[in-house]
């Protein structure tokens, strides 16, 4: 990438600040700050969907995420729901594809992941709701669906317990497939969840999949809600991409989308 292309890409970056505000990342200094943590969020692969090149979509995403890892280490990758498209027979093949990732990865259940809980947990060795701590940062993963593919709000009781357990941690990142705010056609209005998370000032961002046509950062109660486009499926943004998140040494969070080769829509939170 030449200097003009780099500066053009930088102008699209976003920085997420600890007070919930977002600002454009206007200069190279935003990228020059050292990272304390770096991860990728992807979603909506829809492995097995008819009349789509789902195997190619997964192959491209895995290769490009691994390329990011080679460029600068990724501590983890999150696949935020709709790994498969309805048919549980495709679950083993989708896992084999994601096993090509060269960093630890975690998954959440989406509405098209229509798999019995015991099969899901047996396949991924992960619960439907679970937490992980990476470099003293908390990651909370929650289901927003079930074997029927119903749209569900996150498990508020579970999240309340975990947010209270981790209230003294500096940063909490939350991952749920369906956006819990009704600001998109496919979102749902989870008022109890919204009221819960705003009580915890260490919640740095809530990451959503599901809405293939969404690529922005939205703010509610000073909490950023981040979308990541889609890596598969038959609709959505013209590109198939994923989100990169970089926690800086000063605790700013720089985030941008890869489409999946070029950097776009960067922000700091």
Per-range role (PLM):
Residues 1-17, 21:
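N-terminal secretory signal peptides and thylakoid transit peptides that target proteins
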Residues 18-92:
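N-terminal active-site segment of His-dependent metallophosphoesterases
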Residues 32, 47, 121-188, 257-260:
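Conserved catalytic scaffold of divalent metal-dependent phosphoesterases
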Residues 33, 53-55, 59-60, 64, ...:
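Binuclear metal-dependent phosphoesterase catalytic core
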Residues 40-60, 85, 114-124, 147-153, ...:
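Acidic/histidine-rich helix-loop elements
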Residues 44, 81-82, 110, 177, ...:
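Active-site glycine-centered loops adjacent to acidic/histidine catalytic or metal-binding residues
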Residues 67-76, 149-224:
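His/acidic metal-ligating clusters that form di-metal
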Residues 80-99, 115-125, 184-187, 216-221:
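Metal-dependent catalytic neighborhoods of phosphoester/phosphodiester hydrolases
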